[in-house]
């Protein structure tokens, strides 16, 4: 079949020209900022006055005075605008979609999700990086939805979004606004609860942004507990070692029982629950809304389980003693409360070895200090000769390096030198 050139031309996807970026023009910016009347002027006595001045726009961007721009939409962005977020559009198509649907940075849907949140939750391997850069502003960065999540936390939903996370964290530093530090802390919690093995480099970015490594969520869980209890991660040795080197609290107690399946409490589950909750049902003409999560039980708040309890539970299915031994390397000294004889013997041996080393150094510490001082300060020692030689070199004296070698080895003449060479 012969296809006309006109039809072929209509299917051709235009290339993105960096010098003429369709996402960087003034029309797109005005729509995103909800500045629909920016170019409208009023005339009074022959003088034109702009309705929306450039100064007013700058003021709103800096100080967050954007209440008149906020719009709540009575539908779900994840469903209505999924074509925008799923990574299937190139830049020109994104620009056209924003124009046609009047997408703004101040919109949120019926469960308080913003377009920035949706772009982050759909992104895989930074597929929505350009869209995130386009959508972010002070309002939708700090905005929380009905599940108490932010756009930054949703960037951890799928793997590989390290550039998006880095960009969002840099946005905090580069822009003129303050945020609740718990936005960063909560994101570190979500990092530790993903279905895929968490990326250490992402955690480093959050810690650099002053995320607390010992932060607890509302259930009393920490990033260390989440990682230990997640059976999606088979080998967590490197993750645990990283947290230990960063100073995670290994003596922390928690209300979370090791027998609980923490993996069932995925942080992304709440999104689906809210989506279902937003759907109305009618029974006998009466509207019924499906119930959301059960409230967290506040009656049992006293911590009674140690991190070691969780490690022992994990050992029952992965047989990894190395993580347990690392805890003792970083200062843990208590024996675990378990009936597992293999673990008891293993940890007793570690504790006994540590106590022996510590007792040895306590006993011989004075002698070791004396030997150290002798090596450093005793006249005639190698170190003292090096210090002496360094002093003479820096003082400008004429030196004969061979003389120091001969003196040190007791070589007084040529015969003794030849004898030593022959012996070697």
UniProtKB/Swiss-Prot annotation:
What Gene3D superfamilies does this protein's entry cite?
Ankyrin repeat-containing domain
Question: Has the keyword Repeat been applied to this entry?
Answer: yes
Q: Where are the ANK repeats?
A: 115-144, 147-177, 184-215, 219-252
Cystine connections: none
What keywords were assigned to this record?
ANK repeat, Repeat
Q: Does the keyword Repeat apply?
A: yes
Q: Name one Pfam family in it.
A: Ank_2
Q: What is this protein called?
A: Putative ankyrin repeat protein R858
| Protein's organism | Acanthamoeba polyphaga mimivirus (APMV)
């Amino acid at each position: 079949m012969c296809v006309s050139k006109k039809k072929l031309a209509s299917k051709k996807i235009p290339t993105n020209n960096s010098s003429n970026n369709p996402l960087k023009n003034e029309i797109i910016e005005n729509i995103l900022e909800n500045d629909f009347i920016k170019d409208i002027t009023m005339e009074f006595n022959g003088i034109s006055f702009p309705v929306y001045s450039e100064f007013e726009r700058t003021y709103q961007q800096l100080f967050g005075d954007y209440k008149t721009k906020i719009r709540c939409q009575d539908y779900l962005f994840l469903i209505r605008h999924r074509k925008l977020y799923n990574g299937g559009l190139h830049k020109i198509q994104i620009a056209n979609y924003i124009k046609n649907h009047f997408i703004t940075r101040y919109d949120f849907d019926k469960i308080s999700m913003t377009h920035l949140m949706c772009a982050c939750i759909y992104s895989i391997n930074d597929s929505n990086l350009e869209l995130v850069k386009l959508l972010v502003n002070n309002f939708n960065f700090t905005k929380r939805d009905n599940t108490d999540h932010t756009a930054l936390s949703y960037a951890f939903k799928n793997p590989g979004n390290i550039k998006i996370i880095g960009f969002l964290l840099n946005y905090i530093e580069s822009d003129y606004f303050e945020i609740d530090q718990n936005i960063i802390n909560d994101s570190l919690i979500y990092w530790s609860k993903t279905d895929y093995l968490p990326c250490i480099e992402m955690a480093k970015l959050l810690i650099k942004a002053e995320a607390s490594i010992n932060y607890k969520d509302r259930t009393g869980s920490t990033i260390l507990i989440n990682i230990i209890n997640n059976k999606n991660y088979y080998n967590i040795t490197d993750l645990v070692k990283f947290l230990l080197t960063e100073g995670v609290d290994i003596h922390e107690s928690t209300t979370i029982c090791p027998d609980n399946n923490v993996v069932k409490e995925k942080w992304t589950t709440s999104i689906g629950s809210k989506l279902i909750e937003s759907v109305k049902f009618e029974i006998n003409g009466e509207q019924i809304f499906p119930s959301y999560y059960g409230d967290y039980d506040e009656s049992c708040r006293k911590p009674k389980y140690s991190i070691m309890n969780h490690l022992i539970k994990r050992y029952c299915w992965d047989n990894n003693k190395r993580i347990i031994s690392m805890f003792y390397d970083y200062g843990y000294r208590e024996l675990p409360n378990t009936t597992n004889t293999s673990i008891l013997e293993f940890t007793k041996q570690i504790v006994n070895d540590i106590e022996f080393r510590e007792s040895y150094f306590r006993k011989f510490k004075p002698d070791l200090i004396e030997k150290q001082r002798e090596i450093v300060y005793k006249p005639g020692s190698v170190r003292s000769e090096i210090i002496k030689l360094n002093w003479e070199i820096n003082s400008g004296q004429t030196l004969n390096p061979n003389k120091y070698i001969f003196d040190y080895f007791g070589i007084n003449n040529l015969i003794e030198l030849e004898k030593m060479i022959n012996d070697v």
